[in-house]
Amino acid sequence: MNSKIIEAFFIVALFTTSCLAQAPAPSPTTTVTPPPVATPPPAATPAPTTTPPPAVSPAPTSSPPSSAPSPSSDAPTASPPAPEGPGVSPGELAPTPSDASAPPPNAALTNKAFVVGSLVAAIIYAVVLA
C-alpha cells in the first residue's frame, strides 16, 4: 500500500509539472514613462565686442556704406517649436491616465485553477490506485 501512495504521488507530480509548464505566464507589468521633453538650447551669449581705435583720417564719403549685418540682429534665438497643426502628435499615441488606472490581469486565478485541478487529479489517482 505504501508503494502505491508513492507511485500516485510521482504520477501526480508529473501531471502537475506538465500542467504548470503549460500555464500561461503572468503578463509583464508595463510602466508608463512620460514622453521626453525637449529642452530648449541655451540662449546664445553675444560675443564681447572691442571698440575700434579712433580713425586718424576720416573715411572717404564716396564709398557706399557696408551692408554687413550686425551680429546682434542675426544671433539665433531659442524659441519653442511651432505647433504642427491637426496632425497626430506623439502625445496622442501615449497611453492615457484612464488606461493606466486599469488593474493588470490577475494570473493568480489561472495558477490556482491548475493547483486545484492537480489536487482533484491526485485524489482520483489515489482512489483508483488504492
Swiss-Prot record:
Residues annotated as glycosylated: 24, 26, 28, 35-36
GO CC list: plasma membrane; side of membrane
Domain of life, per lineage: Eukaryota
Post-translational modification: O-glycosylated on hydroxyprolines; noncontiguous hydroxylproline residues are glycosylated with arabinogalactan.
Lipid-linked residues (GPI-anchor amidated asparagine): 106
Record keywords, A-Z: Cell membrane, Glycoprotein, GPI-anchor, Hydroxylation, Lipoprotein, Membrane, Proteoglycan, Pyrrolidone carboxylic acid, Signal
Designated gene of the protein: AGP7
The name this protein goes by in its record: Classical arabinogalactan protein 7
InterPro entries: AGP
Residues with the Pyrrolidone carboxylic acid modification: 22
Keyword DNA-binding: no
Source organism (scientific name): Arabidopsis thaliana
Region (Disordered): 22-108
Main localization of the protein described in the UniProt heading: membrane
Pro residues composition bias: residue spans: 33-68
Subcellular location: Cell membrane
Membrane topology: Lipid-anchor; GPI-anchor
Prodomain residues: 107-130
Similarity annotation: Belongs to the classical AGP family.
Function, in words: Proteoglycan that seems to be implicated in diverse developmental roles such as differentiation, cell-cell recognition, embryogenesis and programmed cell death.
